[in-house]
Amino acid sequence: MRAVIQQVKLPDTGRIIAISDVHGNLLARLQLRDEDTLVFCGDILEKGRYSLETLRYIMRLASERRVLAVLGNCDFWQDAIYRPTPGSDEYCKRYLLADSAGWGPGLLAQMCQEAGFDMGRGMDMEEFRRVIGAAYAPEFRFLESLPHVIDTEHYVFVHGGLPEGGHEDWDGWKCMKNDNFLGQGRSFDRWVIVGHWPVTLYG
């Protein structure tokens, strides 16, 4: 899948606040002002019981303020609904029946619970996609609208990191999941703002 790159002109005033892996209450502490630009550098979902609530909150925030977002490797569920493969169906079923490594039900499981869709080992994945895709079309459209990279005059925002080579050849997945990007020893002509890799792992 080719990387989607969005060109953005940032305003000259206000703070530019970039956050990633929003598995906490940071937003409440930011005290956002009207002139601020909030950039989500991916992984707005998963690792908690409030993925659906968080997604809706960010969608609402994006309709009220200047909010930008890129896809992270934990946000990429629209393909499971719109472009499934036999492999993705199996992965999706295992994910739905698991406990997200102890974090509780993830986004799709939360959608199933809210919609009253029965998740069992014998569930029909085609029916799952039909029911959940229809019930949560606005949420999937929002995720579908997110780029892998936001390119601005002074900053590049990406979840995992920028792959090697020219941007026309970048793979979207490698933008979302690019472990230890800082440790790759590369340099750029602008600040590259990433998430994904916990700061403690760079120590």
Where do the protein language model's features map onto the residues?
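Acidic, histidine-bearing metal-coordination/catalytic regions of metal-dependent phosphoesterases
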Residues: 1-18
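A generic local structural motif
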Residues: 2-6, 27-29, 55-56, 143-145, ...
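Short, flexible hinge/linker loops that cap or flank conserved catalytic cores
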Residues: 9-11, 32, 184-186
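Short coil/turn segments at beta-strand junctions that form active-site/ligand-binding loops
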Residues: 14, 34-37, 65-66, 148, ...
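Core catalytic region of metal-dependent phosphoesterases/phosphodiesterases
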Residues: 15, 19, 24-100
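Acidic, His/Gly-enriched loop-helix segments that form or flank divalent-metal centers
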Residues: 98, 102, 114-203
